């Protein structure tokens, strides 16, 4: 069976193999077909990472995180780091984070206060038994954390912060309340509610919000309401900080692409009967989504969204999410470029792209 076409992965992976024990095990964990071999690699990987963090000497881990040869190896490595950073013994701390993606629209620059609506949030969470443990014997930071601050925390910092309650309290002191800057126009952001508890919160982590999704959205809508700004909030599942960061970053970029795409389609339809969409990979770890008229006679200024691939992004999922959006918007003229574009080169218009090697994914799954 032929595999469906996936755009080229142009992330800057190492060109020669790296002799790093962590990467060797992470690669085996990601790619070995033997369950026994994967289990052994997983155990060795976690043991090695645990030893490095406990000795506060993890240069090899930092190297491995920047030199993974593919997305699967990187994901295996990060999953192992995440496992080691969970509360493993009684008395250790389990950190958790709840991402909130915010779509903002305003006619001038604004500052959004990020205080945590603790009472309303706890009342909402307590209504759902599968989320209730987040409110029992837990401690929450009284304000939301911005993505740049949370992503700047090292595995070594998280390791120290999970040792006991005293270390967790010291860790919380590193954060400070900062308003979120909303630029003029439309923008998409992600912030995080951060807290800690014991091992009993672990079953909640990664659970789908289910029926709690809409009530939680209403809590954030009311708490973050700002005069002169239109806000839409999208709460995501509670998770460990590392996984919450990955979920939040991916969803923020996906929602930014959705907002850009619908705006571009609307503006082109005002001037042309048919919208043409071109999708192509570009060297440097980017996927470009371009919108224009199908007919060169109606072409307008190209509107292009650039997706910067994170280390954990799966291109096939990014592609499929975009294709689903195009179907929802009733766009039929879509063209996937088979070959990656050189770095800094421009994405061709729809009319130009049809002369290049590619296909329409709605009518052909294969090149």
Predicted regions and their residues:
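Charged, amphipathic alpha-helical stretches
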Residues: 1-74
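Detector for methionine-enriched segments
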Residues: 1, 45, 52-53, 65-67, ...
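Short cysteine-rich clusters marking metal-coordination/redox-active sites
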Residues: 348-357
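C-terminal recognition-helix end and immediately following basic linker
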Residues: 346, 360-367
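Extended, non-transmembrane interaction/recognition domains
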Residues: 105-349
């Amino acid at each position: 069976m032929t595999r469906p076409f996936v755009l080229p992965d142009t992330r800057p992976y190492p060109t020669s193999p790296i002799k790093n024990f962590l990467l060797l095990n992470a690669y085996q964990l990601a790619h070995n077909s033997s369950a026994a071999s994967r289990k052994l690699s997983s155990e060795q990987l976690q043991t090695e990472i645990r030893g490095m963090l406990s000795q506060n000497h993890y240069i090899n881990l930092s190297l491995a995180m920047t030199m993974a040869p593919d997305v699967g190896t990187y994901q295996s490595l990060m999953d192992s780091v995440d496992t080691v950073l969970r509360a493993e013994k009684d008395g250790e701390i389990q950190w958790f984070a709840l991402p909130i993606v915010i779509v903002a629209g305003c006619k001038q620059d604004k500052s959004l206060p990020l205080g945590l609506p603790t009472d309303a949030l706890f009342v909402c969470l307590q209504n759902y038994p599968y989320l209730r443990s987040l409110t029992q014997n837990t401690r929450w930071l009284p304000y939301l954390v911005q993505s740049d601050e949370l992503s700047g925390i090292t595995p070594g910092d998280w390791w120290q912060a999970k040792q006991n309650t005293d270390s967790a309290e010291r860790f919380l002191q590193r954060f400070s309340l900062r308003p979120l800057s909303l630029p003029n126009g439309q923008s998409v952001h992600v912030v995080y509610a951060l807290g800690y508890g014991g091992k009993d919160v672990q079953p909640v982590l990664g659970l789908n919000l289910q029926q709690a999704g809409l009530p939680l959205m209403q809590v954030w809508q009311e708490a973050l309401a700002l005069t002169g700004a239109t806000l839409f909030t999208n709460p995501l599942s509670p998770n460990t900080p590392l996984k919450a960061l990955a979920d939040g970053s991916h969803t923020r970029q996906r929602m930014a692409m959705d907002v850009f795409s619908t705006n571009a389609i609307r503006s082109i339809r005002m001037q042309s009967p048919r919208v043409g969409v071109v999708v192509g990979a570009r060297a440097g770890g980017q996927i470009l989504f371009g919108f224009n008229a199908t007919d060169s006679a109606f072409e307008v200024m190209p509107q292009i969204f650039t997706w910067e691939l994170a280390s954990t992004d799966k291109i096939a999922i990014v592609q499929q999410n975009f294709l689903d959006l195009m179907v929802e918007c009733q766009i039929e003229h879509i063209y996937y470029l088979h070959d990656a574009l050189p770095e800094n080169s421009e994405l061709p218009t729809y009319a130009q792209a049809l002369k290049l090697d590619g296909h329409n994914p709605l009518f052909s799954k294969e090149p």
